[in-house]
Amino acid sequence: MSTSLLTNLAAVAVILSKTDQLARVATFQSPESSADEREEALTDLLSANVRLAHKVAKQHVRNGLDFQDLLAQACEGIIHAASKFKLDSKASFTTYAKQWMRARCQEHVQANA
C-alpha cells in the first residue's frame, strides 16, 4: 500500500456509523458487487479506520522499524478483516479489524526484529 494513498486517506478520514460500516463490508464481500463497488467500499472502510490504524502502528514502533511499514501492515489488517468479518457478528467491524491490525503489526515486528 503506497504511502501517498495512506496520507490521502488520513486527510479525508470519514466517520461511518456501525450500520454504514456493515453496509460497506457487505458490499466488499458480495460476489454480485462490481470491482468498482468493492474498491469504493474498501476505500471507505480504510478511510473510516485509518486513524485507528495509525494508533495501532504507533504502538508497535520500536527498534528502528519504519512507521509507514507498520501503518501499511495495519491497513492490511483492515483489508483482511473486511474479507473475513461475519455480518451477523455482535462485535463491531472496528473491534474486529483492530485485532487484525494488531496481529499484522506484531507479525511485522517479529519478522523484522
Enumerate the language-model features and the residues they cover.
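Alpha-helical promoter-recognition and RNA polymerase-docking modules of transcription initiation factors
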Residues: 2-113
